[in-house]
Amino acid sequence: MITSTSREQSAPSNHPKRSSGIRLPVVIAAIIVAIVALFASVAMSCSSQTKYDWSNLKLENGRMVYYEDGNAVSTTGIDVSDLQGSIDWQAVKNDGIDFAMLRCGRRGSTEGQLYTDKNYYENVEGATRVGLPYGVYFFSQATNEQEALEEAEYILNLINGAGVTYPVVYDQEPVTDSSGRANNLSADQLTKNAQTFCKRIEQAGYTPMVYGNQYDLSRLNIDQINAAVWYAEYTDTHPTSTYHDFVMWQYSHTGKVNGIKTDVDMDILFEASWISPER
């Protein structure tokens, strides 16, 4: 960033100016202007790269809805874990929720142990019983490709025959504990981990997805990962980031839904094409 445009004034010259000459400061100024213009052009290009027209995004009764040609094309979802406790899934469905993303498990951020979410099976049974489609997400703390593959296999065992039709999500976030085992991994390593996970999930016939907010995604070489993006940014207007095109957006962590006693994360899926056949 250029913080000052002041330049020292040179002493008067005894030589006459050449009418066709260009002084060095002028050349430098021209170069600076060109660089600024280039960055402005890139910024404008990045700001317009999203494929969505946010004027078609509406907040209706606390829920985000996306329209195309006057028709609602999005679906409304929630994501839950054992933090929400026992859920009345019939009440959830009756409240207009179209799908759910269930946390199926996590890896410990310090010791690296794999855990199944305490309410996972209860949530699977409840959502299935009322006919509410769902996907799953796993909180990864893998430090290498081998551990990422281990996580993918762990999930595939959990969801085998469970009727998952929505994406299987790789959720890698740094933890506040300074001893977090994956906090200081390089972008290359984090990317390789995500690639390994998503490739295995896709091989098994499910739709892989990567979750993150602006910071989480910036830690990855996201364009090298063959997976959809579930983006997190809490606002009641529209996403402000154009970091990457995403197909699902987590827009609130304080949602109110019948059948759930706590606040809950609210999500919108923009395109139904990301739903896979039941397995």
Question: What do these predicted regions represent?
Answer:
Residues 152-160, 221-230:
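Short, electropositive alpha-helical surface patch
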Residues 1-22:
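N-terminal Lys/Arg-rich, disordered targeting/topogenic segments
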Residues 15-35:
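N-terminal Sec-pathway targeting helices
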